[in-house]
């Protein structure tokens, strides 16, 4: 024990981070110095089975006349927590079973969903939540879910090919949305309008997501992942009149060297964002195929207020076709700086 007492607090906290949460908290009875050390831990894991969880709670310092429970622990101990950031891992199903009598004042929450109803149950006890990540992975039986959180500002939603999946509803005034919906079967996606949305990351497998298009009209920064046969980009540009920054990525293995940007569907009329607001354009995984060239040239010759355009190619310069044509292509903005960066560090302007 004398060996540990001679170590600085940050080293002791590092040591505590390698042991289970219940063990770390139990060290608070060792001495006055150890009483609050566990409160500097950046991660607390309460994902234990019920029996282990209750055993853990009994190691905490409570008034023995008061009811011992996880909610009591969170109410009394977490407000004293001193770490600048806390990741709390908890068995939500256990919380639902024991019955909630209080609210969780958590602002950041990540959850892997197995049941749609349980998600809304969790959200209903988080009234000040502003950052939420929801993951629906393969083999998880999530049929549908709804997200209604008035305080929510940032949402990350990842949906894989779940075995049974009908769709989802999002009704919250977001400022940031990251949507990775790669579920290949038909499903509904109902996103209510988000007038405060400023940035969106969109990676979707299906094109028929009309509510998605209508919900991002106020976005100023758009990050979009190209997928083979997807034709949603033209519609995204058309319905984002305030767009200032456009970042385009391409899924390696989906958009190949032979296909290029085959999913670019040129709009009938020039989108308003190109004529009025777009200032920064970035494209990664440029292959130099004719489809790639046509897409970039379209942006350059129609973006009247473009300041910078950066094109990133994976291959060395001598393996990327049409670079000269791209460099000499007309630009609607006389102040636009075009930068083309190829593999192995070569660059041309």
UniProtKB/Swiss-Prot annotation:
Q: Which residues form the F-box domain?
A: 1-47
Matching entries from Pfam families are given as: F-box, FBD
Gene3D superfamilies (UniProt xref): Ribonuclease Inhibitor (3.80.10.10)
Q: Where is each FBD domain found?
A: 263-311
Q: Which SUPFAM superfamilies match?
A: F-box domain, RNI-like
Its recorded name reads: Probable FBD-associated F-box protein At5g38565
- Organism from which the protein derives: Arabidopsis thaliana
């Amino acid at each position: 024990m004398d060996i540990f007492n001679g170590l600085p607090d940050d080293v002791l906290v590092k040591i505590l981070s390698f042991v289970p949460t219940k063990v770390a908290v139990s060290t608070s009875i060792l001495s006055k110095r150890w009483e609050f050390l566990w409160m500097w831990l950046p991660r607390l894991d309460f994902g234990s089975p019920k029996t282990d969880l209750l055993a853990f709670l009994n190691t905490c310092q409570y008034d023995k006349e008061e009811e011992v429970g996880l909610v009591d622990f969170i109410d009394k101990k977490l407000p004293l927590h001193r770490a600048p950031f806390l990741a709390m891992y908890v068995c939500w199903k256990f919380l639902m079973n024991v019955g909630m009598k209080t609210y969780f004042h958590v602002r950041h929450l990540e959850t892997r969903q197995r049941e749609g109803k349980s998600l809304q149950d969790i959200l209903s006890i988080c009234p000040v939540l502003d950052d939420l990540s929801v993951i629906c992975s393969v083999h998880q039986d999530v049929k549908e879910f709804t997200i209604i959180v008035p305080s929510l500002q940032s949402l990350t939603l990842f949906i894989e090919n779940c075995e049974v999946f009908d769709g989802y509803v999002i009704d919250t005034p977001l400022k940031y949305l990251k949507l990775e919906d790669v579920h290949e079967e038909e499903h509904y996606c109902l996103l209510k309008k988000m007038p405060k949305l400023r940035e969106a990351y969109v990676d979707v497998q299906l094109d028929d997501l009309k509510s998605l298009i209508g919900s991002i009209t106020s976005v100023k920064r758009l990050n979009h992942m190209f997928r083979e046969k997807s034709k949603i980009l033209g519609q995204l540009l058309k319905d984002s009149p305030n767009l200032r920054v456009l970042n385009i990525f391409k899924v390696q293995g989906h958009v190949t060297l032979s296909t290029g940007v085959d999913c670019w569907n040129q709009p009938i009329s020039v989108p308003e964002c190109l004529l009025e607001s777009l200032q920064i354009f970035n494209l990664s995984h440029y292959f130099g195929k004719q489809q790639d060239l046509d897409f970039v040239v379209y942006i350059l010759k129609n973006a009247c207020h473009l300041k910078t355009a950066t094109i990133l190619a994976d291959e060395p310069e001598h393996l990327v076709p049409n670079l000269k044509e791209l460099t000499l292509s007309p630009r609607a903005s006389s102040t636009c700086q075009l930068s083309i960066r190829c593999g192995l560090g070569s660059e041309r302007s």
